C-alpha cells in the first residue's frame, strides 16, 4: 500500500502541474530520489501531501516505504512515473484521450453469485493427497474449498504493462496472478493485435493498431473492482474515464479521441448492465451467441471488424472474471454449478478459436475441479445417464468435459450418450422438429464427442456410429431449410437455435450450392436473405462439423477421395457409401439410372472389407410397390430409407431404430413419401447389402391421373381437328 501511495503522490503531482500550472521541480534521477528520501527520513518520517485542486490530503510514511520497497524498485517506480517529462508532452497525452460526459451510477451491486453451497449440502476441504473417491454421489451436489479452485485459475504470475511497451504507457508496471488472452488480425506491419488480462480483481483488454504510433492509438477497456484497477499515470484519472459503475464494479474505457467513434458503436451502460445483472452462465451464453453471429457474417478475420472483436473479447474476459470473482467471494463453492460454468467458458473459448484461429489463452486451468469431476462421472452407468432428468444429464456432460483426461471419455458415458440420443430421436420422429431444449443437449453432446478420443471398445464404437446415423436422420431437407431461415437473421439467433444435428451427421454434401437448393421457397425470404442464411449456416457447419470419415471402418476398404463422398450409412452388418463415383471392391448401385441428372452411386461394403455371398458387379435397383406401415413386427428396423430429388440429389435419410420410428415414418408430418411430388424418389437401404426402390400406390394413382389428363387433351385435339376439317369441306 505504501508503494501505491507513492505512485499516487507522483501521479497527482503531474495532475496538479497540468491543472494548476505548478512549476515546482522534483528530483530527476534515482540517485537524487534516494538522497532526497534519506533527507526526508532524517528530518521527519511522515510526509503530508495535500492536493489543492480537489482538497485531498494524506500522509506518506517514508520509513515504512523503504522497508517494503527496495532501492531498485524505487528507481523503477520513479522512472515509470515520468516525473521529469515535459508538461507539454503530458498535456498532449491528456488531450489525445476521449472523456465521457458523465459516469452513469447504477444502484445496487448486480446479481448474486449462483454457486453458493446450500446450507443442507456437505462441504469438503480438499488438500494435497486428498482421497477423491471419498466424495459422495455422481452429480457434484456438494461444496469444495473455493481457494483451491481459484489457485488453479490464477496459477501464473505475470509482469504487466512494462515501460518498453508503448501501448501500455498509460499504466504503471505491475506483477499479478492472471490469465492472458490474445488475438492477432492481419499481418505484423499493418494488422491489429488484441491483448487481454483477467485477474482476481480486474479485466484489461487492449486494442493496438500496429500501423500507427501505439502510444496514440492503443485503446483499453477495463472492468473490475474500482479500488483495485491498475494504477494510471498522472495525465488521467479513473473518475474521468469511468462510463458506468455500481456499488461493486466499474467499466472504464481509455480511448483515443481521434478514433473513439469507431469503438463506441454500442451503449456501454447497457453492456455494463448486461454484465452485472445477468448470472455468469447467462452472460457467457450471450457472448457465445455473439461469436456465432460474427462467424455467420464471415467477419472473424476481417480487419474492419476489429472494433467488434475488441468488444467481444472484452465481454468474453469479463465472463471469465465473473466466474472467478464469484468463486473468490466464497469459502466453498458447489461443484455441479461451477462445472456448468467452466464447461460454458470452455465452449466459449473453443468457438472463439474456431472463429479466430489466432486466439490463445494461457491459464484458467481446472486441475482440482477436473479430479473431482472424474470421480463423479466414473460412477455414472449408461442406463443411469439415460434415465436422468435433462438438467442432470447436462451436469454430467459438463463434468465429462472437465474430468475426461486427454479425451478419454469412459465407455459407460459414451454408451449412455448413445441411449440418450436414441430416446431423443424416437421422440423427434413424432413431430419432425427440434426445440431449443433438444438443441442445447445436442450441443453438449457435440462438445463431448468431438473432444473425445475414439473408444477402444469396438462395441461402443459401433453404438456411436449408430448415434451419428440418428443425427444424420435429423438433418433432413426440412431441417436445412429451417437453419437457412434462421441464419438469414444472424442477429436474432441464440447459441442453441443456431445448433443443428447436421453438425454431428454423416452427410458431406452440404456445400453452399446444395444449401441454396434446399432453401425455403417463401416470399418471406428475399434472395439476399437466402444468400445470407446459406453463407452463415455453411460457415458454422464448416467450423463445427464432426470429422467423422475417419470413424467409418469401411472407408479404409476403398481408395475414394473425401470430396467424392456424399454421405455414409453405417448399419450393423454393412456400410453404404453414397458418392459421385463408383467404389471398387463393393456392391455398386447406380442411382443415375433412375432419372437423376447427376451421377450418384450407392456402394455397399462390409466393415471388415470382406465380400458378399452374391455378385459384386454393378446391380440394378429393383422396385417394390404399395409399401405402407407394417402391421406386425419391424421389417424396416436396422435399415435406412433414403429420399432424393431428380435434380438436387440426396434430400433425407431415415434410420429405422425401432417399431415406433417405423410407424412414424409414414406419418403426414414425415418428410418421406410425398404424394404430390413425382420428382422425389425413395430407396430402401437394407442391412444385407441390397437396395430397393419404393413406389407406393400414390405414384401409380398420380401416373394414372396424368395418363387420363393427357388422353383427354389428345381426344379433345382430335375432335377439334375433325371439326375444323368438316367446316372447310362443308
From Swiss-Prot:
Q: Where in the cell is it found?
A: Virion membrane; Host cell membrane; Host endosome membrane
Q: Which GO terms describe its biological process?
A: fusion of virus membrane with host plasma membrane; symbiont entry into host cell
PTM summary: N-glycosylated, O-glycosylated, and sialylated.
TM helices/strands, residue ranges? 707-727
User: Which intervals of the chain are annotated as region Interaction with gL?
Assistant: 190-254
Keyword line: Fusion of virus membrane with host cell membrane, Fusion of virus membrane with host membrane, Glycoprotein, Host cell membrane, Host endosome, Host membrane, Membrane, Sialic acid, Signal, Transmembrane, Transmembrane helix, Viral envelope protein, Viral penetration into host cytoplasm, Virion, Virus entry into host cell
Q: Which Pfam families match?
A: Herpes_glycoH_C, Herpes_glycop_H
Q: Which residues form a coiled coil?
A: none
Gene3D superfamilies noted in UniProt:
Herpesvirus glycoprotein H, C-terminal domain, Herpesvirus glycoprotein H, domain D-II
Family designation: Belongs to the herpesviridae glycoprotein H family.
Q: What does this protein do?
A: The heterodimer glycoprotein H-glycoprotein L is required for the fusion of viral and plasma membranes leading to virus entry into the host cell. Following initial binding to host receptor, membrane fusion is mediated by the fusion machinery composed of gB and the heterodimer gH/gL. May also be involved in the fusion between the virion envelope and the outer nuclear membrane during virion morphogenesis. Targets host EPHA2 to promote KSHV entry.
What is the name listed in the Swiss-Prot or TrEMBL entry for this protein? Answer: Envelope glycoprotein H
